[in-house]
Every structure is written in structure tokens, then in C-alpha cells.
Amino acid sequence: MFSSINRLPLIQNYFTLLIALIPVSFIAGNLVINLNVFLIIVSSLLIFGREIVKIKIIFLDKLFFLFFLFIIFSALHNDIYFITNDLFPEDFKTLKKSFLFLRYLFLYFSLRFLIEKKIINLKFFFISCLFSTLFVSLDIFYQFIFGKDIFGFVPTTRKFSGPFNDELIAGGYLLRFSIFSFFLIPIFYRKYYNKIFLYFLPMLLIIFLIGMILAGNRMPFIMYMFTLSLLTVFHQNLRKYFFILATVVLIVFSLIYKFNSIVKDNFDNFYSQVSKIIVITYNKDFQNNNQPTYFKEFYSFYDTWLLNKYIGGGIKNFWYYCHVEQTKKTGKLKVCNTHPHNYYLEILTELGLIGLILALTIIIIILYQTFYKKYFTSSSLKNNNLITPFIFLFISEIFPIKGTGSFFTTNNATYLFFIIAVLIGLTRKNNFIENKK
């Protein structure tokens, strides 16, 4: 155990490398993500165990403890139901999954400590984001031109996944990591700001936009536009680029939409589905047999939630309660997905009203301590540009009116708790010094 954290350059470099590898691990897949998370947690506990234990516990930390404790309680409650009714051959399956999910509580405290104590140099994370997202974008271009990417992966009918093969998540990846690239020069290489940034920004934006459009993930593309718009509105240094941004987006999208039938069909299909959802919702025609697939997945949460209104059905049990229990209850086959494709609806069905209230309270506090304090008060956060991309990517990630993957999967949970840990670490006292290089 080391008593001093200020004279450990090798250890600082080690943790900086692990954090810089996060964008790379998301390309490599869940196995590498889990390995990286494991190394961050175990290394932090082995090296800084006593210091982490002594970290000042704030109110938000207590809410995180309560949230994870409630996950365990919900799992235990549901597993007892499964065992007494002889439903699952594997005893306490939900409880085991819930204990494994506890790794994200350890990840939060480990990362928060490393950020708060300035052990990690985030510059290399930003550099990694730049090169990783450029690689994904260029690989998508290659796949679009030659019919397969550099690894030999071929695209689906309407989407180009690049290095992700049959996982259609390239657009989501670019949304999550490419925005950090825009802040690399303004934050870490300020002396080059006036010389190359005006050329650097439009070039990157065009590359990432084309990559997003070809990837075919419509919701990530919309959230990308939404996030960039928020950045230009709230971030003073970017406000003057709003019309440049809008012009570039309009031209790039219009050209690709007009001259590429695959992209046109993909976005036309999305527009058609959204229009149907609006009409069905407005007319309250929820029994319509022609409901879009996404609407059916969203709407499937309601009857499932009614089965366990207050404490939920336990994490990753949505399919069981939606499909098996409702089929038994109604006598009709109920076909369901593994989750309702929305973080909030998933938490509501799997952790009930109590779990959702805890999650919403945590989100509101984080937004207050970061977004509100930076842009609506005289807090010292006003001068901290390092926190800016993390704030708006957090808003994008937890935006309520959008389709999502499962909250409890490796990919989504790792990203979300990483963003949260960095945000809270950066807001702590005496942690507002940025790299002046």
C-alpha cells in the first residue's frame, strides 16, 4: 500500500493508460471492456485501498449505495419467488447477476478517487477518443466503398457497422466518443487553437457526420445533432460556430440522402415509424395491430411493470415477466424483447417505482452539481472546460425520450458510470485545474 499518491509517476501512467484504452475496449467488445474494468478496480484497491476507503462520502455516494443495495434486495425478493414456485433450475440467478453488477459501484468510487486526486491525465483519453473514432469512421467508409471493412466484415441491408461486425452500434459509438475529439485542441493544445482549430473542427465534423449517417443508427444521429446543438448554445466559445455547424450538417446530410438510396430508405423508414408512433399516441390507439416495432417494445413495459410495481422484477428479468408470466396470466402467447429499449422503462420494470425514484434523484443531483452550477451560477466550474463534454454526453446518455439498449449491460453500464465518476471527480473541491499546454 502506498501512502503518497503524488510521487508515483509509473502508477499514474498505468492508470492513465487504462483510461485511455476505454474507447479501444469498446471496439474490441465486452470481454476487453470487462478486463479493463477489472484492472481499474483491482489495481485501485490494491494500490490505494486505504486512501479510497477514507474518501469523503457525499450525499450522492450514499444514494449510490442505496441504489445498489436496493438492486440486491429486489433480486433476493424475486429469487425467493422463483425458488418457491420452482421456476428456474439455477437458484438465486438474479442475485448472482446483481452481485456481479456491484462492480460498477466499485468502478465509480475507484474512478472518482483517481480523478479527484489527479492521478489520471485525461489528455490521453481525449487523444484515444480522436484516433478511435477516426478509425471507426474511416473503416465505415472503407466498408461502404468496397463492400467489406478492413477485417472482412460485410454490412447489413441498410446499415454499415464497420469494425463492430453484426453489432449495429457504430453510430452509438461515434456519439459517445467522437465529441471528445472536438475538445482536444482547445483544452490541451491551446497554443494551436487559432492556427488549426478552425480547419480541424469542420474536417472532423464532416468525417464523423458521414460515418454516423452511413452507420444507419437513426437515434444516435439525432442525439448527436441534439448534443452538438446544446454545446453550441451553452458553451460560449462554441456559440459563434453554430451557423457553421448547422450549415455543414445540412449540406452533408442532404447530399448523402439525395444520392444514396440506402441512406434515403433508412431515414425514410425511421420517419415513417416516428409518424405512426405520434398518430397512435395522439389517438390513444394502443391496440393498433400495425404498431411500429419500437412502439411495441416501449409499450410492453406497462403490463410487465404492473406485476411488480414497487420493487420490480429484478435486473435482467424483463423477458421472463413480460413473456412467461403474462402468457400464463392471459393464456395468450406474449412475445417480448429482453428489455423495453428505454433506460427509465427498464429500471421501472426491473427495480419498480422505488428504484426509478432513486435513479431519478441521482440524475437530478448530478445535473444540478454539473450542468446547473456551470451554466447558471458563479461556481468555479464556469472556468472548467474539461468537464464540458462529459456534461453534455451525460445529458445525451440519460435523455428520457429515446430508444436505448439495456441499462444493465456491460457496454452501457461501463460508459455511464465512467461518465458519472469523471463528472463527480471533477466537481470536487480543488479539482478545477486544467492542463495548460
Place the predicted regions along the sequence by residue.
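Transmembrane alpha-helices of multi-pass inner-membrane enzymes
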Residues: T16, L39-L45, F183, M225-S229, ...
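Transmembrane signal-anchor hairpin modules in multi-pass inner-membrane enzymes, especially those
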Residues: M1-F92, F113-K123, I127, I185-Y199, ...
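A conserved mid-to-late transmembrane alpha helix and its immediate loop/hinge
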Residues: L209, Y299, N308-I311, K332-T370
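Membrane-interface loop/short-helix elements at transmembrane-helix boundaries
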Residues: G162-N165, S272-Y321, C336-E346
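A membrane-periplasm/extracellular boundary helix in multi-pass inner-membrane enzymes
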Residues: A215, H235-D285, Y299-L307, I315
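Membrane-embedded alpha-helical segments of multi-pass membrane proteins
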Residues: A28-R50, L95-F109, A170-S181, F221-S229, ...
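Aromatic-anchored transmembrane helix interface
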Residues: F65-L66, N85-F113, F124-S128, T133, ...
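Alpha-helical transmembrane segments of multi-pass inner-membrane proteins
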Residues: A20-P23, F106-Y108, N121-P155, N165-N237, ...
